[in-house]
């Protein structure tokens, strides 16, 4: 069995999990999420609020889907209870971020400012002009929005200017040798 897939998922108090055919819906204090499980994988509610994910056989595809399905459901439960946060930093002279309602406005050295609108279920928090965070209950959506913001101005390996994740180490390159 998949080492990840065979682990049972404990459902904390205050979280309601509904299984309707292949669709799993999770409701918690922060909101609700739903996901459709891939065809051969089965999910069942056990006693004491435990979810078990099983697969019919040991085919390679089923092994991969087993661990994936279990992790996606576990991430949904974590999302509706705690939520997910991706923190980002901006470094560079004149680079900054401003909160404009629920949107972010970036000054990243271009001739124009860039506005990023918050998708449904995502909120932005600006802690300082060079530090902000992306928050939400859907782990995939939080990571995707953070990656798209980072893509606006990737960190430069020569001067380390740009948008980077908090704690991300930028490998610096040596510039061209002068005479």
UniProtKB/Swiss-Prot annotation:
One of its GO terms (molecular function) is rRNA binding. The keyword Transferase does not apply. This protein binds to the 23S rRNA, and is important in its secondary structure. It is located near the subunit interface in the base of the L7/L12 stalk, and near the tRNA binding site of the peptidyltransferase center. SUPFAM superfamilies: Ribosomal protein L6. Gene3D superfamilies: Ribosomal protein L6, alpha-beta domain. This is Large ribosomal subunit protein uL6. GO terms for biological process: cytoplasmic translation. GO terms for cellular component: cytosolic large ribosomal subunit.
